[in-house]
């Protein structure tokens, strides 16, 4: 009985303590906010994720309504914040913009997604 109880406790501990290792990184927040309308031209798009990211394998692409790329292509992690990804924007005018991301979290899982925001000064 004692051996079965110990095995059950070991199994339970393994499940509980390894749960973090299987957590994928999901978008937790963004600026501009998904679906929002902003009145001032943002200098950059900032994305906040639930898990640490691998910068070398994480990308952000921002396009206008015609599909033209309007980011500077320099997505990088925020200094001291391994869950925050930033990409500077070119000078943009009024319209709808699409933000697409593809990130690799430290658990080695790739997650991607997109959202839009509108600029209406």
Language-model region placement:
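Bacterial N-terminal signal peptides that target proteins for export
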Residues: 1-9
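N-terminal edge beta-strand
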Residues: 23-41
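Short strand-edge motifs at loop-to-beta-strand transitions and within beta-strands
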Residues: 83-87
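A glycine-anchored, Pro-Gly-centered beta-turn/N-cap motif
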Residues: 93-102
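Cleavable N-terminal signal peptides
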Residues: 10-11, 21
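Extended, polar beta-sheet/loop recognition surfaces of beta-rich domains
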Residues: 40, 44-51, 108-121
């Amino acid at each position: 009985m004692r051996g079965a109880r110990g095995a059950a406790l070991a199994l339970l501990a393994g499940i509980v303590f390894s749960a973090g290792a299987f957590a994928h990184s999901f978008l937790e927040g963004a600026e501009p906010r998904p679906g929002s309308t902003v009145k001032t031209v943002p200098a950059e798009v900032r994305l906040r994720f639930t898990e640490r990211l691998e910068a070398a394998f994480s990308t952000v692409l921002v396009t206008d309504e015609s599909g033209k790329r309007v980011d500077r292509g320099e997505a990088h992690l925020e200094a001291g914040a391994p869950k925050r990804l930033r990409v500077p924007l070119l000078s943009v005018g009024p319209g709808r913009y699409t933000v697409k991301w593809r990130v690799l979290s430290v658990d080695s899982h790739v997650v991607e997604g997109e959202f839009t925001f509108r600029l209406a000064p």
